[in-house]
Amino acid sequence: MTLTQFIKTNQGKKVDFDGKYGAQCVDLYRAYCRDVLDIQQTPSVAGAKDIITKPGVLEVTRDSALADYSRGDVLVWDATSSNKYGHVAILVAVYNTKYFIVFEQDGFKQDGAKLAFRSREGLLGCLWRNGGY
């Protein structure tokens, strides 16, 4: 399955990969690993922010001024004062130096998977599959 097919299939749906805690951002990430990347699941994590330290077979790029992000990369954000778990989303496009267009799911709102603008603020980096998408 391609990223475009994944988005079309899951847009507006509540993706609950593990059947626990409702539809969270990590559930969409795990479905993406299964359906698009076709890789073994990465290790369990306490929150989305921890995915970057347990990438499994995926490569890691830490955020910096020189970081180069590509469509299909898995972006990981750190915890905030209002979200101790962090966030994970799939990169659809780089909008500019400060924003991305992502495919994501919000575990707090429980409103299903959607395309959204997401700030680079708090970005830890990304996971990507060696060999492309």
Predicted features along the sequence, with ranges:
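Generic beta-strand structural signal
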Residues: 94-96, 118-119
